[in-house]
Amino acid sequence: MFYYNDNRIKKRCALLMSIVLLVCLAAVLPMQVRAADAAIYPMYQRAVDFPQGDLSRLAQVIRKAQAGGEINIGFLGGSITEGRGAANVQDCYVSQVYKWWYEAFPLAQINVINAGVGGTSSYLGVHRVDAELLVHKPDLVFMEFAVNDTFTEFCMNSYENLIRKILMSESNPALVLLFATNAVGDSSQAVQAALGQYYDLPMISYGKAVTPEVEAGSFTWFQIAEDIVHPNNMGHSIFAGLITTYLEDLCAKLDTIEVDAARLQQYELPEPVTMQVYQNAHIENAATITPLEVLGYDVYDFNYHFGDNWYSMQDGSYISFVVEASNIGILYQRTVEGTFGQYDVYIDDQYVKTLDGNYVEFYGTETEAEELFASPDGGKAYHVIKIVKNPTSFNTDFVIIGLLVS
């Protein structure tokens, strides 16, 4: 149950209502001005219309902030979390949520780690979460992969592995699942929310909040988004407002939430639903692994987020590695520049697949993560990975960002 009788909740909902009304008025939509309850409460109630989840970890973070402690808040996700669509960094939902914490708890030291990377799924997330987020010992993590993950067993597996990694990390962080959506309402929310319920986690859905409003004509999708996926300033404000309203609600009922610190320290995860194959997942790059053989590749920081890449620009180039793993993937760059070619991957002398560095879009680049090998029995062994230019590829450029190893 959620309570709205606290003045802070009313103020937050009033802010959300003003956002929605500004969207509508900006387009001069033929609609009636609705009361606050009718305009906002349904949006917020839909957004949090999940089983409540275990709030003890989150309540512990709030109490630590109230006491003036240092709070590390992590955000893990794709381009929406990175801030795509917002005009400026301060306009993205992550910055707005940070501002709420900063203003709500002036005695606390609030640190935010934004580990959002555009175009990436939970498969890459489970390989990078240790180095990019968990190393900072977060007290609270917000995670959003609903748009970039697909309705597949593969993504369900990586998403659950990621949940377990975060919950069992050294700092015992609270974890809140976020679900974005796109213009046609597609997302992997159903699968991810089922896992969230299984692990008794708090959840907030931007999709459940805005999609019915778009369908009802309260506002159009492109009044809250810059394209079919990414929220604009207004969309980011709505997303942030849903999260901060949820936090206001939690503050209002904080005294009713019991926290057993000893039990949290001895927390044991329930049995996994999927195979646990990514618990030791990490990324190997040019700074951490030496090629077995290499010709025509230079070490270069091509990717703005992931440094120490291998970059080939010549015909006949090849590179090979030896890794001990039960699962092997690759992270490589795709671009619209028109100079990137196709490269073949072999593992233990067996052809696996062809990677296409050419990105068929109107603009930009894409950081592509693909699994190449999965051990049938989950056992580790040494494997040789070789990457060579496809003989039919006219273009020669190719960037290997790293190997995904677990």
What is each of the regions a protein language model found here?
Residues 92-111, 120, 124-255, 310-316, ...:
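Alpha-helical cap/lid subdomain in secreted, periplasmic
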Residues 79-80, 116-118:
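Catalytic nucleophile serine of serine hydrolases
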Residues 79-82, 232:
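Ser/Thr-glycine-rich phosphate-binding loops at phosphate-binding pockets of nucleotides
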Residues 76-79, 219-221:
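Short glycine/proline-rich turn/loop motifs
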Residues 1-74, 81-88, 106-108, 237, ...:
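N-terminal secretory targeting modules
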